[in-house]
Amino acid sequence: MNFKSICLIILLSALIIPYIPQNIYFFPHRNTTGATISSGLYVNPYLYYTSPPAPAGIASFGLYNYSGNVTPYVITTNEMLGYVNITSLLAYNREALRYGVDPYSATLQFNIVLSVNTSNGVYAYWLQDVGQFQTNKNSLTFIDNVWNLTGSLSTLSSSAITGNGQVASAGGGQTFYYDVGPSYTYSFPLSYIYIINMSYTSNAVYVWIGYEIIQIGQTEYGTVNYYDKITIYQPNIISASLMINGNNYTPNGLYYDAELVWGGGGNGAPTSFNSLNCTLGLYYISNGSITPVPSLYTFGADTAEAAYNVYTTMNNGVPIAYNGIENLTILTNNFSVILI
């Protein structure tokens, strides 16, 4: 039995989904092999995915990769943005009901790690701003999750984190925070921006999760909507930031990566994309300016939801994802186009 099969069994055994409309878990990976993940000169993006299906789109592991010559880098910021413009979308997985999600569901996940440095040690929290699609009904719902990556299991309590949502059990001793945001009926083109920003004091981190709809069909928008404002209570904070770090793994062996990736509808489910055409962009705020994340891979690795039949390439300096056989590789070392 291979590693991904073991992970899948663990995830399926943990599914206890309370009946709350649109309540969806977006699982982080877990190191279930018992192997020790040790840091070398830089992280290895291929610990969890070496072949399809994988979360597909664009992601930064904090690595420049020039034909195998790898150089790590670190980005710290208080705000990150994920841009998407979709002109075609249809996904289907006939096995989806086994995971508790609709067969036509899919997600586009904007995932980033919050690093909190305290006098007691370093804590890591996985922030997810997710577009959950019912692709046969042209329905989009925004959902967020927060997971604790500091220990081998994610543990959060209602006294440790508050917001518009709530803490729930994911089974297997894990707890996480989630909130269900607004829903939209869409037509194409559909373009919007995921937005995550944060600030901190000596005893708490404040996270705003939201989006900005740019266009649905022929209607243009432009208003930012923060649908969740989260407080993570943490004593003795020295510093905190949203982090991309190619030098180190999180305390539980995942990545300090930033992901804008397609996957299944939730609960660790994969899906296959029968139709897809979209433009993607990954950005952070530096000195008050929107700045492209420079190097991008074609897949993410922190999330367990994965995709078949998504091929990502560059077109005139811009990442494009459409139907095709996945290639898990470096996409560019020089993303510089500002689409926002």
UniProtKB/Swiss-Prot annotation:
Pfam families: Thermopsin. Optimum temperature is 90 degrees Celsius. Thermostable. The keyword Signal applies. Residues 1-28 form the signal peptide. It catalyses: Specificity similar to pepsin A, prefers bulky hydrophobic side-chains on either side of the scissible bond. One of its GO terms (molecular function) is aspartic-type endopeptidase activity. Its main location: secreted. May represent a new class of acid proteases. It digests proteins and peptides in acidic solution. This is Thermopsin. It comes from Sulfolobus acidocaldarius (strain ATCC 33909 / DSM 639 / JCM 8929 / NBRC 15157 / NCIMB 11770). The lineage of its organism: Archaea, Thermoproteota, Thermoprotei, Sulfolobales, Sulfolobaceae.
